[in-house]
């Protein structure tokens, strides 16, 4: 089994405190901005009101994405390693300390994250799969293969009946839908029972019992290198940022068809997020200092906002009317006002920031 360096694992498992990292102790706000540093291997806890980092905690090497538990007390970080590593780092946000890692075993390359009630949904690139970890039992209790290469980012609908993933190297989007299947019939080769005068007996097929739940997958081809994506606030459309083609693919979720392929010339596009009102889509690019802004109604570029020398993670702030953009080459998170579409501040969260998330303590 592949592992990352043992010193890091022991460092995390020991529950290292913020005092050990030389940080002054401050209470974690009820609502916190979480930001990863890929270079420093840390998670920063930021006060969104003051934009000050109040604490940092260690995570494993090559951290990419972060998400908070539904109660806002714990953070989970995917330790990616280009598909080699197999761990989720765990941070106690109240105690501001690292907890023992979650070993994902053969589910190598965890990356995209989402919450499913009290559980954590994650992609596993190396296994071409998605899976769910249950913190209550400390077990992975569900795995579903996609059959696609580099299953990277993931989204689950609010009713938890559909899951969407981008599959970078297959240039596809997977739509996994929860379906109910009829009872199974008798085993192969078994002689079916006969009803009156040789007719089939009434009722469901024998041998199968009750209807059962399963998942049905629809695979939709999109532009090459699709990675970042988002679902419109009304749930009608899914847009992907296709890094290799430089295009944006627009999928109608009702028909499950590509409505449009926009020639955005967005080579290297890494993330795409809709504004809370759904009127704009923001696209970050790894090798370009401008944040692209698209009008979703016309599906045309609306503006570009200079934010630095390249960017990755995007996080919307519905309460504050802001977007936070992780600018890796510049070692800061840019704060963008969504009304003026201008940069209003920067946050030093550590070297090469990437994954961003909210934690709201219940």
Which role fits each region the language model picked out?
Residues 1-11:
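Bacterial N-terminal signal peptides that target proteins for export
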Residues 4-5, 15-362:
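Predominantly soluble domains enriched in secretory-pathway, periplasmic, or organellar proteins
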């Amino acid at each position: 089994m592949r592992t990352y360096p043992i010193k890091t694992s022991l460092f995390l498992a020991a529950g290292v405190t913020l005092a050990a990292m030389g940080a002054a102790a401050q209470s974690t706000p009820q609502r916190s901005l979480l930001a990863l540093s890929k270079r420093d291997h840390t998670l920063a806890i930021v006060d969104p009101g003051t934009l000050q980092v109040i604490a940092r905690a260690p995570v494993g090497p090559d951290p990419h994405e972060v998400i908070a538990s539904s109660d806002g007390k714990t953070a989970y970080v995917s330790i990616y390693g280009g598909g080699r590593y197999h761990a989720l780092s765990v941070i106690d946000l109240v105690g501001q300390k690292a907890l023992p890692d979650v070993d994902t075993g053969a589910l190598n390359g965890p990356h995209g994250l989402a919450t499913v009630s009290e559980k954590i949904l994650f992609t596993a690139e190396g296994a071409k799969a998605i899976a769910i970890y249950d913190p209550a039992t400390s077990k992975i209790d569900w795995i579903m293969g996609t059959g696609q290469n580099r299953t990277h980012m993931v989204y689950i609908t609010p009713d938890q009946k559909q899951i969407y993933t981008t599959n970078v190297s297959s240039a596809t989007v997977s739509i996994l839908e929860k379906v109910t299947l009829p009872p199974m019939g008798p085993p192969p080769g078994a002689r079916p029972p006969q009803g009156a005068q040789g007719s089939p007996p009434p009722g469901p097929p024998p041998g199968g019992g009750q209807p059962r739940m399963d998942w049905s997958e629809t695979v939709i081809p999109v532009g090459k290198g699709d990675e970042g994506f988002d679902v419109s606030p009304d749930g009608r459309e899914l847009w992907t940022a296709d890094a290799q083609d430089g295009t944006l693919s627009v999928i109608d979720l009702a028909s499950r068809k590509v409505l449009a392929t926009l020639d955005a010339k967005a080579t290297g596009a890494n993330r795409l997020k809709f504004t809370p009102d759904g009127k704009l889509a923001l696209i970050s690019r790894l090798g370009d200092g401008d944040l692209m802004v698209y009008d979703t109604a016309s599906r045309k570029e609306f503006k570009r906002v200079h934010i630095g020398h390249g960017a990755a993670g995007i996080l919307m702030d519905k309460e504050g009317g802001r977007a936070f953009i992780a600018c890796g080459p510049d070692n800061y998170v840019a704060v963008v006002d969504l009304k003026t579409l201008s940069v209003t501040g920067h946050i030093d969260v550590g070297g090469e920031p990437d994954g961003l998330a909210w934690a709201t303590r219940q």
